[in-house]
Each structure stands twice: as structure tokens, then as C-alpha cells.
Amino acid sequence: MSEKYIVTWDMLQIHARKLASRLMPSEQWKGIIAVSRGGLVPGALLARELGIRHVDTVCISSYDHDNQRELKVLKRAEGDGEGFIIIDDLVDTGGTAVAIREMYPKAHFVTIFAKPAGRPLVDDYVIDIPQNTWIEQPWDMGVVFVPPISGR
């Protein structure tokens, strides 16, 4: 990854609210399924904005085995996704998205960020990100003191 895209808490909330406004009216949804872990915080934000109390998770782990990237489903929500929003923070190459689509073919799959390779796999997203860009999410960062350049 050659570039970095830094996401602040404020930016994330603004993007989540924009996405929530596109998902109105909220009564059309039975609930939200957040993809663990990246979709947990956006899922909480959507649940708040849409007034949805039924929130579940699908937990997927990816790991390298003989240089192949494999997905392992650790926990899944029941059903085919009908009436549910599936939320993840990002669709990148589409590996996780393909697995989600297979598990929940009737769900409405959304993300905050989308890279070109995965974009066709989601129903909606807010921000386009170049494929070679690494996203730094606010839950992965802390606020630290940065000394002045002059050193004084």
C-alpha cells in the first residue's frame, strides 16, 4: 500500500449518518448484522441513527495458509439476510464480501468505504478509496503528543 487515508472519529460519524439517511425509512429493516470486527463501530452508529435495536454479528477470520488467503466463519447470524442491513467498514478486494453475499443473499450490504475491486459487491457505500490506499480507522489509532519541528 503506497498511500494512507486517515479516518477520524468525526469523519466516521459523518459518513455513517450519510449512509443512514440513505437507508431510510428505518421501518423497512428487521435489524443490522455487523461484520466483525470492522463493521462493529459503523454498525453501532447505524443502529443509533436508524433506531434499530436488533443487532447481530457475523464473525469472519482471514489467515494465510500456504500463501493462500482463506476465510473462516467463526460465527454467523441466522437466516438469509432478508430485511437486514449488513455493514462493514470497507470493501477491499471483495473476498469477505463474496462470502457475505453467499451467506446472506437477500441482505442489503453496505460499507462506509469502497475500493474499486470490491465496489460492485456492495449495495451502497459512502467514500471511494483508491485500491492501493491503506485506511487507518480511528479505533486503531491513539492521540499522541507531537513535538514542534523546531524542538523548542
UniProtKB/Swiss-Prot annotation:
Kindly list the positions annotated as binding guanine.
Answer: 92, 135
Question: Which keywords does UniProt give here?
Answer: Cell inner membrane, Cell membrane, Glycosyltransferase, Magnesium, Membrane, Metal-binding, Purine salvage, Transferase
Which residues bind Mg(2+) per the record?
Answer: 89
User: Domain of life of the organism in this record?
Assistant: Bacteria
- SUPFAM superfamilies, A to Z: PRTase-like
State the protein's name: Xanthine-guanine phosphoribosyltransferase
| Pathway membership, UniProt | Purine metabolism; GMP biosynthesis via salvage pathway; GMP from guanine: step 1/1; Purine metabolism; XMP biosynthesis via salvage pathway; XMP from xanthine: step 1/1
The UniProt record lists the keyword Protease: no
